[in-house]
A protein has these predicted regions:
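Active-site signature of alpha/beta-hydrolase-fold catalytic machinery across serine-
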Residues: 74, 176-180
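Short glycine-rich phosphate-binding loop at a beta-alpha junction
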Residues: 57-64, 149, 159-168
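Domain-level recognition of soluble alpha/beta enzyme cores
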Residues: 182-213
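Phosphate-handling substructures
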Residues: 75-136
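Active-site-proximal alpha-helix that buttresses catalytic centers in soluble enzyme cores
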Residues: 2-4, 11-79
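Short, well-ordered beta-to-alpha junction loops that form the rim of enzyme active sites
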Residues: 19, 63-65, 86, 165-172
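Conserved histidine-centered catalytic loops in small-molecule metabolism enzymes
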Residues: 6, 53-86, 111, 202-238
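Alpha-helix capping/helix-boundary segments
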Residues: 66-68, 137, 173-174
């Protein structure tokens, strides 16, 4: 996958939270329920496409749920996403489908709040389990990228130059991946629907896992059509 003049390949990675569903609008815990985007969510998404606020993608990944796939289809028409099965949202268990007002008198919910979100969701998933699952999905994404490079090299076309990768996922997936790879608190990386984070992955020949570099909120990246060169100047739920 490496040509003779390169000992490092860097790609731009954008993690995008899907646009809004009705449950998102109502503040409900939306995990394993496979809900579609709401009409308002679709309208906002289509406007974002018209405004060209998202980067282009040489390769597109997505979680398997409808809200991610619909977002990916509208953001990147004509591109078929590679689906990562591990990138479903966290299983909220007994809290699924409920909002704060409905749960406010539930002692199990109060215990979960008091724990700072550390306790496992009753009848659901723990944060540690969810992070492990999300990271396993990321490793699968990296595997797919390496296979693309290797297939292009084997075909005699040389390395395929992947410069920009987008992944449409859930808010929880973004928090899981960034807290794992960048450090900090899990909830430091919350993203609203349609928002996310952008940065670079640096792959070094023979150096194992890629390094995460310079990730920042997508809202801080002012672009009409993002290119890697523009973004690398000046190195420095549901």
């Amino acid at each position: 996958m490496w040509n003779r003049t390169e000992d490092q390949i860097e790609i731009h990675l954008t993690l995008i939270r899907h646009w809004a569903t009705l449950s998102n609008k109502e503040g409900r815990y939306l995990g394993k329920t496979d809900e579609t985007l709401s009409p308002d969510g679709i309208s906002a998404l289509e406007k974002s496409v018209a405004d060209r606020i998202y980067p282009t993608a040489d390769v597109l990944f997505s979680g398997p749920m409808k809200r991610c796939l619909e977002t990916a289809q509208i953001l990147y028409p004509g591109q078929t996403p590679i689906i990562i099965p591990e990138w479903t949202e966290m299983d909220f268990g007994a809290f699924e489908g409920h909002n704060y007002q409905e749960l406010s008198k539930d002692p199990n919910y109060q215990r979960w709040i008091d724990s700072g979100g550390i306790l496992p969701f009753p009848e659901g998933e723990s944060r540690e389990e969810f992070i492990r699952r999300s990271v396993a999905g990321y490793e699968k994404m990296v595997y797919h990228m390496k296979m693309i490079w290797e297939r292009s090299a084997a075909s005699g076309q040389g390395d395929r130059k992947i410069q920009s990768v987008s992944a449409v996922v859930h808010g929880g997936t973004i928090m899981a991946l960034l807290s794992h790879f960048l450090g900090g608190e899990y909830f430091d990386y919350q993203a609203k629907c349609g928002q996310g984070y952008s940065g670079r992955l640096a792959f070094k020949a023979g150096k194992g896992a890629p390094q995460w570099k310079e990730f920042r909120p997508l809202s801080e990246v002012t672009v009409s059509e993002v290119t890697v060169s523009e973004l690398t100047k000046g190195e420095t739920n549901g």
